[in-house]
Amino acid sequence: MSRSLTKGPFIADHLLKKIQKLNAQGKKKVIVTWSRASTIVPLMIGHTIAVHNGREHIPVFITDQMVGHKLGEFSPTRTYRGHIKTKGDKKSKR
């Protein structure tokens, strides 16, 4: 279910302030955040935002195609190692 248009997109206040400050200075710096629920807006294009995935911060470079998505979509939280075979597993060979 999508968010109501009258409410507007959710962006964490601290993240928005950091981006506006960097845009005013004209600098591009990695911004560290834990806010995975924040929506990507056009102000963020060209910045690199390090999004926390529960263990570490994953750097995400924001492009124009990402606008409207959430930051958490680009920082996976689970590592899939495949279906690992054990050494003595004879049943899987049948």
From Swiss-Prot:
One GO-annotated biological process of the protein: translation
Keyword Plastid attached: yes
Pfam families: Ribosomal_S19
InterPro entries linked to this entry: Ribosomal_uS19 (IPR002222), Ribosomal_uS19_bac-type (IPR005732), Ribosomal_uS19_CS (IPR020934), Ribosomal_uS19_SF (IPR023575)
A cellular component annotation (GO) from this entry: chloroplast
Keyword Ribonucleoprotein: yes
Domain of life: Eukaryota
Keywords assigned: Chloroplast, Plastid, Ribonucleoprotein, Ribosomal protein, RNA-binding, rRNA-binding
GO molecular function, one term: rRNA binding
Localisation per UniProt entry: Plastid, Chloroplast
Family: Belongs to the universal ribosomal protein uS19 family.
Protein purpose: Protein S19 forms a complex with S13 that binds strongly to the 16S ribosomal RNA.
Name listed for the protein in its UniProt record: Small ribosomal subunit protein uS19c
